[in-house]
Amino acid sequence: MSTKNFRVSDGDWICPDKKCGNVNFARRTSCNRCGREKTTEAKMMKAGGTEIGKTLAEKSRGLFSANDWQCKTCSNVNWARRSECNMCNTPKYAKLEERTGYGGGFNERENVEYIEREESDGEYDEFGRKKKKYRGKAVGPASILKEVEDKESEGEEEDEDEDLSKYKLDEDEDEDDADLSKYNLDASEEEDSNKKKSNRRSRSKSRSSHSRSSSRSSSPSSSRSRSRSRSRSSSSSQSRSHSGSREHSRSRGSKSRSSSRSHRGSSSPRKRSYSSSSSSPERDRKRSRSRPSSPAVRKKRRTRSRSPERHHRSSSGSTHSGSRSSSKKK
């Protein structure tokens, strides 16, 4: 059969023998070349396109021939010598794939392949990488490794031979023999009464000491209040003496003026005697009112009591001079 006139149709199959690879018609049950029977391993052929034929070739007016084929996927018309489509690369004769209906979803085939991984204590893992605990250690000779192992074994033996005194179980007997006087529940009532009396005495002592300290602390406060009351009384007496002296000076001035106006023609010794007689009871009143409480306050009051006398003398002198001038004019 010539290759030019060979046409693949749906259902044709390829011989499963790799050395043969002959394409047989769909109606054959055995290979036409090697005689091997058709099995399930034989792959079915599928035509990727169909020939256009003479009618379409005549309509193309010499552009295509009857052997040219049209692709089934993109419907492009390809030359007969092409084994693949010029547009979508679909093969002219393709192997028919099994239609299983599997789309590749999760657990679609129901036969999931589990990879069994064995965890070993080796130096390398399943991917051939060195484990972390072995990365920092330098590989030394076998003698050094043996020494390290011997040291580790000796350390374990020492740990086993440690002092086990803290794990002794015979300590309970020693505790039973200890002094149990503090746990005596049959103590007499006299001891309890003595303890109560001692507690009461200590409390009374603490209260008495507290009252003494409070009385001591209150004494300076009382002395302060007394000193404040004294200072206030002295200040009030000073203010009273000031007001009395001012009133006395005012009364003197008014009396002198009235006497000068009414008795211009009278003599001066009468005026002096009148002023001295009028001022003597007022001075006695001053002295009775302002009795100093301390020597410093007495000095201050003496100086203040002298000042109105000077004022009175000056006023009397002025009145005397006025009376003299009036007598001369007469």
UniProtKB/Swiss-Prot annotation:
GO process annotations (BP): mRNA processing; RNA splicing
Zn finger region (RanBP2-type): 9-40, 65-94
Tissue expression summary: Expressed in kidney; more specifically in renal juxtaglomerular (JG) cells.
Any one annotated GO CC term: nucleus
Principal location class: nucleus
Modification type Phosphoserine: residues: S9, S120, S153, S181, S188, S193
Biased composition (Acidic residues): 150-163
Modified residues (N6-acetyllysine): K18, K54, K92
Keyword tRNA processing: no
Comp. bias (Low complexity): 211-224, 232-242, 315-330
Keywords noted in UniProt: Acetylation, Metal-binding, mRNA processing, mRNA splicing, Nucleus, Phosphoprotein, Repeat, RNA-binding, Zinc, Zinc-finger
One term of GO molecular function: lipopolysaccharide binding
Basic residues composition bias: residue spans: 196-210, 251-273, 297-314
Pfam family, one: Zn_ribbon_RanBP
Cell compartment(s), UniProt: Nucleus
InterPro entries, per database record: Znf_RanBP2, Znf_RanBP2_sf, ZRANB2
Positions of region (Required for nuclear targeting): 151-324
Keyword Ribonucleoprotein in record: no
Positions of region (Disordered): 117-330
Its job: Splice factor required for alternative splicing of TRA2B/SFRS10 transcripts. Binds to ssRNA containing the consensus sequence 5'-AGGUAA-3'. May interfere with constitutive 5'-splice site selection.
Subunit and interaction comment: Interacts with the C-terminal half of SNRP70/U1-70K, the Arg/Ser-rich domain of AKAP17A as well as with U2AF1 and CLK1.
Family: Belongs to the ZRANB2 family.
Domain remarks: The RanBP2-type zinc fingers mediate binding to RNA.
Protein name: Zinc finger Ran-binding domain-containing protein 2
Provenance organism: Rattus norvegicus (Rat)
